[in-house]
Amino acid sequence: MPNLSKVFEKYIYKKLAIYFENIFSKHQCGFRKGLNAQHCLIRLIEKWRECIDQGLEFGSLLTDLSKAFDCLPHDLLIAKLKAYGVDISALRLIYDYLTNRKQRTKIGNEYSRWRDILYGVPQGSILGPLLFNIFICDLFFITNDFEMANYADDTTPYVYGIDITSVIDSLEKAGDLVFDWFKNNQMKGNEGKCHIVLSTHENVHVNIGTSQIKNSHSEKLLGIKIDSDLNFEEHISSICKKASAKLNALARISPYIDEGKRRLIMNAFFNSQFNYCPLTWMFHSRKLNNKINRLHERCLRITYNDNLSTFEELLNKDNSVSIHNRNLRALAIELFKVYTKQGPDILQDVFPINNEARYNFRKKAHFTTRAIRTVRYGDNSLRHLGPKIWEQIPSDIKEAESVEVFKSRIKSWIPDNCPCRLCKTYIHNVGFI
């Protein structure tokens, strides 16, 4: 793309992004400032946990779109921009940006004829993802009877009800509405490639259009393996396996490289395995936590060529903390953003704030603690543990003037009395204390 076009593209992007920020659904998490895949997954998983904790059944439909960014029709996009109130001069500029593009195919030394590109947004452009978000914005207008998680072209409607029969019925209706929208908007939805994950282990089928889809025990969504029990054992075992393979490679080359290079490799290839959307799976079983800690300890021993120190001594040598404590700090940062109203609206639903301080100036606003019914889904949820962990953070850290200051201060914090099951002590006939 010519440099002059890039300047215009950035200018159009800035204006459109500001204009549409209040139009986009809070559930649209892709390609938006302050939102990411982790926020999308947190909202979905926490709603799932909340429903099961309340004795309800839950169901989700993982839809499939073929080449979504390449199939977007230009004329329909322009019509939608006009309907949203974009003025005529801006429409002409965007129309010129999209149209009069050509492509051809090369096979060996032979070329096809040039053909006009009538669909899709420019690949690798700044403006393309934003235009895609605008195009699918009205998809959320049909979600009166169900909710929907969305990140770019990954769209996952989900429902809940008093029994699995009502959930299947609602999910079929939601799926039909979503795929009708795809068809009416000239998007290529693949009903046969969809996946269903329900809160039941029963072998049931869901009819979406002309396809009959069998319930799956687990499926990958946005890079995270989600199972019907929400224990994330498959996902954590998978990333541990990948991390172990990286450690084997590091162990083989460690005699030939210095400590500084080993630390770089550790951060790039080991730590990165556990850095993707960790808040979705951080409160797992003690067994899985021990598995992660053993790998982490092995990694530090290889990095520092130290087979004598304890795990705690190795962490001190590395000036780091365990992966669980690192995740607690990451959660604290998200809580701070919500508390100071700098976080995305989608997390305000997960961590609601009690605003009684508005009427009683002696009290400070605090996160609402919700009643729970079960240990697995209630006590183990972010919505339950988040407010408790927030109370563990010292006031001088929580009163930071900005997110950057909070991030700097939280690096020194390790909870003294973390309420999660991983940090509690189990006593026979008593339970976790």
Model-inferred region functions:
Residues 1-122, 159:
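Conserved pre-catalytic core of RNA-dependent polymerases
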Residues 1-5, 29-38, 51-53, 66-70, ...:
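Conserved, non-catalytic sequence blocks in retroelement Pol enzymes and Pol-derived host proteins
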Residues 12, 64, 81, 94, ...:
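Short, conserved catalytic/metal-binding micro-motifs enriched in Asp/Glu and His
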Residues 28, 58-68, 94, 120-128, ...:
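Catalytic palm active-site di-aspartate
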Residues 56-59, 190-194, 257-268:
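Short amphipathic alpha-helical interface segments
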Residues 173, 187-219:
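Short, conserved micro-motifs composed of acidic
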Residues 213-280:
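Basic, alpha-helical interaction scaffolds
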Residues 287-433:
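Short linear motifs embedded in intrinsically disordered, charge-biased segments
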